[in-house]
Amino acid sequence: MSLHDPASLRTARLWRPRRVVVTAAARDHAHGRAILARAEALGLPVEALPGNRLTGLRHPDPRRAYIEAKSTLAVVVAPPAKLKLQPIPPSADWRVDLAEGCPAHCQYCYLAGSLAGPPVTRVYANLPEILSNLASYVGRGGVTSASAERAQEGTSFEASCYTDPLGIEHLSGSLSAAIRHFGAWDAPVSLRATTKFAAVEPLLGLDHGRRTRLRFSVNPVAAGRFEGGTAPLRERLSALGAVARAGYPVGLTVAPILPLPDWRAAYDDLFVQAAEALAGAPDLDLTAELITHRFTPGSKTVLEGWYPGSDLPMREDERSRKFTKFGSVKYVFPAELMREMRGELTRSLAERLPMARVLYWTRGGSLTRLPRTPPPGPGSIPPGNPRRRPAGCGRPWRSGRPGGKSSPRRSAASAGRARPGSRGPSPAGS
């Protein structure tokens, strides 16, 4: 079956949480009630909480706590801190959170080192407030807003830092609402989202105005064993082709890059398959982001608790030890291997997908931009009059404490949330 045959859009089973809880405050919002209605229509058990605290999330066994949390969808109101946007280079000017948490079971998940508490998926009921808040950030970013190579993206907003929005779209409807919001927004702005899922049918007919770039997080087939609960690679690539033919700017987030057996041929084949999926897409606007695997001592501890017996390569003696600007430790691939992987992947990508603009290559947190100035085209943001960018464009980042415990004074509702002011992980799926 061809990757751009409509029949190939039949995707893996959608996530069905075993427990859906909705707080009292969330029920006061129309978007929250709509999420509740979708869950009930699917026959999911829904629990209306009397207050705004999430309960029953803790368990003395970390593995059991993980299983229970990963089976729970919580409909809550985003806290005020979510309306104070943080920069998220190298992806975008600003991070906007439509939700927090992910239903997938990726054994390298970076949320393991970025969120405290059980990994419950929270979706925010006050979506109109979140979207209306974005206007005050236009023209103030330091990534695309300040880049000659990416200026056509306008002020960019990344929606995949702490979630995979497509993985919960059948329940939340939040990604569709955000796409429509940006499509109707007459300003130099763009929305970015990354996914490891493939259920794109609800997005294909939206009036997106080419202001949303949908990227698909991909890796060779051999890496699929580390990505439980996600759509198979073939389905993701089919979905990539479908949204490209629906006029969306698209992208490949190649992450996390791993030197698996026969990795050179495997990544080359990945790009061949992507080229097949995109064949015939009109006015194609394609980017690529290349992100290598890294881990911290804290995230490794959390992941080993979540996925005992995983054979994901995380041996410190096979890595280089690096320090972040905050003084924390991370383990990345040795420099020689890093250079070899970068050379092979960028060469293969240029050969198989010459139309792709490679935005950057990350080596475990360090960034190498691979600029290829894009020609003006249909993917460009319509001209506008962005506000003058002030001298400062966000608070300094503070590193979260990977795998740290919550303070006993924190409410149960805050368990699992991103630590305020933290940079957060790479976009979801990376």
List the model feature ranges, each with a label.
Residues 1-92:
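Flexible, acidic/Gly-rich N-terminal and inter-domain linker regions that tether
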Residues 262-276:
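Catalytic cores of alpha/beta
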Residues 244-254:
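A conserved active-site cap/scaffold subdomain adjacent to cofactor or substrate pockets
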